[in-house]
Amino acid sequence: MACVKLGGKPGHEYMFRERAEGKNAVTEIFGKANANFKNLTPEQLADAKFAQEELPFAGELYMGHLRYSTTGKSGIQYVHPFLRRNNWKAKNLCLCGNFNMTNVDEIFEELTKQGQSPRIYSDTYIMLELMGHRLDR
């Protein structure tokens, strides 16, 4: 699950993500996100400004997806959503996908020819880097 705070201020995090794998992944993700609210007073819980400024996962945009690897690879690094971070807010990306690209090898090769060195070899991550490269131009 990912969350974006549209009104995030410079110097403060505005993109949050929790990922987990396994049969209890959804419960684990929401448990971690909800843990931020457990010790708050009723007044704090009712204060939208407090939530916006102080609480992770109290934002305006949310994304989540359950997807099993289509590449035969496993591990937390392959769990969606993927993030691509940048100091320019408009160049940050968050992506989930329900697709299986058949030309990953060609796109990966093109990205590396241009000087990129993608950290993960998966269709969704390659798509994220391709879109990020276009934003960076």
Give, region by region, the residue ranges found by the protein language model.
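Conserved short alpha-helical segments that host acidic/polar catalytic motifs at enzyme active sites
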Residues: M1-R137
